[in-house]
Amino acid sequence: MCIRDRHAIVAGARRAHEENGIPVVLVGRPDEIGDTGGLPVIEASEVIAMDADPGSSVRTMKDSSLVRAAEAVRDANASAMVSAGNTGATMASALLRTGRIKGVSRPAIATPIPGPTGTPTVLLDAGANAECKSDWMVQFAQMGAIFARARFGVATPRIGLLSIGEEAGKGSPLVKETWKLLDEVDWASLGADFIGNVEGRDLMGPEVDVAVTDGFTGNVALKTLEGCARNIVGALLEAFETTEETKAAAEQLYPALLPLYKRFDADSYGGAMLLGTKGPCIISHGSSGEDAMANAISVASEMVELDVVGQIHTAING
């Protein structure tokens, strides 16, 4: 557990431990962490800044909290890693210290995209690999299907390839080549189904469970959806504050809107998962609060219990 906003993160860690019985180890400077509520601490004297270069920071700051957390997983002193710090450095630490699962070409970030049905769409890659190869994206699909089943209970994950049209012949050369490879996979043996191309409008709909794309496109799509959601919520709040009548209407609608808000609230999902490394790694948003951190730790614990790493190893290597 890496420390950034120590108050929210420590509170979330303590809650995950106290309410769910999850053993948590904090990593950082003890004097800055504060009251841990009895949780153990792995001391780390350095902190990788949010704007630091990921690769060079991980290589040179060997006593940073991110590196120490990844080493704890590598050395079996922890089962998983959760961080709300520098995303690139988190990925680099997990990759360089714990290593890739045998047979996995590149790890990918799997991010839940909430939708109206209550079961999110898993989008990957959401930013780990700006440039991809078609065979990497086939592995993303395999890992995403395993994650969707383990995390959200999707019995037969429907895998879609994000493109500019549903027809098989549409898309960039990378998308077209990936489509051919995905169509050749025996998805039934993995308990999944390839449904072909999907479009951006399908990401929040009920038609697809796993949406596969390269990290550049996936990150742009994710940030676009986040921006749209933030602006829509802001516009609604502004509209409700217009008159006394709209304020009264808002109070009446609150019980119905609250469950909808929670369904689309990123904090309820805890964060994204880096799939493909030997140790489970949850990447939370830098602004994560107590709820998000507690949920992220719960997700990490669940992924360990369900042996998602082992399932991916079996799927990739047969």
Where are the model-predicted features located?
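Conserved small/polar residues in nucleotide/adenosyl-binding loops
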Residues: 1-5
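Glycine-rich phosphate/nucleotide-binding loop
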Residues: 8, 95-119, 123, 207-211, ...
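A short, Lys/Arg-enriched amphipathic alpha-helix followed by its capping loop at the start of a domain
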Residues: 12-22
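Solvent-exposed alpha-helices and their adjacent loops that cap or buttress functional pockets
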Residues: 17-19, 58, 62, 72-76, ...
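Glycine-rich phosphate/diphosphate-binding loop of Rossmann-like nucleotide-binding domains
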Residues: 23-33, 130-200, 209-210
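Phosphate/nucleotide-donor binding subsite
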Residues: 37-78
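Short glycine-rich anion-binding loops that position phosphate/pyrophosphate groups of nucleotides
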Residues: 46-47, 86-89, 96, 166-167, ...
